[in-house]
């Protein structure tokens, strides 16, 4: 089984790193709490006059590279490989890609090892990537093709209005994926 894992928000903890960076840069302006997020694009949760400040944080040199792993993500990645799954990291770089693309590779190398960089797929359109499952926090994924993969939503406050697909986090992933493996054998 070919499992595609999104990077930011699924493997790399974009959200909490952003909040920490916001507090350091703008201690006088309260950041939007993760639990209160409504939009997949973090800048959209801020007032128009603050969106440039938000964008400056996540496009800054080193931000993507230095993201901490989501708790449990590295262990789940390694366990899936040990179970014989073909696991790939399928990530969309930011439109402001100057730092992002290289830093995604550096993040994978730092947390999963140099060999894992060969498992990294960067694309603006995930519907063009082949796979059986895509685990992604983006609530709706559209593109040029009808994807072959089944979208499993990685749980986040901004995607909880989507109830038509399986949902997981790194605490319950075994149960959710066991159901998907059973389904694929049927």
UniProtKB/Swiss-Prot annotation:
Record CDD domains: HAD_5-3dNT (cd02587)
Keywords carried by this UniProt record: Hydrolase, Magnesium, Metal-binding
Record-listed Mg(2+) binding positions: 6, 8, 137
Keyword presence, Hydrolase: yes
Cofactors named for this entry: Mg(2+)
Record-level Gene Ontology MF annotations: 5'-nucleotidase activity; metal ion binding
Active site (UniProt): 6, 8
Residues annotated as transmembrane: none
EC number(s) on file: 3.1.3.-
Pfam families from the UniProt entry: NT5C (PF06941)
GO biological process, one term: pyrimidine deoxyribonucleotide catabolic process
Protein family per UniProt: Belongs to the 5'(3')-deoxyribonucleotidase family.
Role according to the record: Dephosphorylates the 5' and 2'(3')-phosphates of deoxyribonucleotides.
Record protein name field: Putative 5'(3')-deoxyribonucleotidase
Organism, as annotated: Bordetella bronchiseptica (strain ATCC BAA-588 / NCTC 13252 / RB50) (Alcaligenes bronchisepticus)
Taxonomy of the source species: Bacteria, Pseudomonadati, Pseudomonadota, Betaproteobacteria, Burkholderiales
């Amino acid at each position: 089984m070919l499992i595609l894992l999104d990077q930011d928000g699924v493997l790399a903890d974009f959200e909490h790193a952003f909040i920490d960076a916001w507090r350091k840069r703008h201690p006088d302006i309260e950041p939007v709490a993760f639990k209160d997020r409504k939009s997949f694009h973090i800048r959209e949760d801020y007032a128009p006059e603050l969106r440039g400040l938000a964008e400056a944080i996540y496009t800054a040199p080193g931000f993507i590279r230095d993201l901490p792993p989501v708790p449990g993500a590295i262990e789940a990645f390694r366990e899936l490989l040990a179970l014989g799954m073909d696991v790939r990291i399928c990530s969309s770089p930011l439109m402001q890609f100057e730092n992002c693309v290289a830093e995604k590779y550096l993040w994978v190398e730092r947390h999963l090892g140099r060999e894992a960089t060969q498992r990294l797929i960067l694309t603006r359109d995930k519907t063009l990537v082949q796979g059986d499952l895509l685990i992604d926090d983006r609530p709706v994924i559209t593109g040029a093709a009808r994807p072959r993969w089944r979208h499993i939503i990685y749980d986040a406050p901004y995607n909880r209005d989507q109830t038509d697909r399986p949902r997981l986090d790194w605490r319950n992933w075994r149960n959710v994926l066991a159901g998907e493996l059973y389904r694929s054998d049927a």
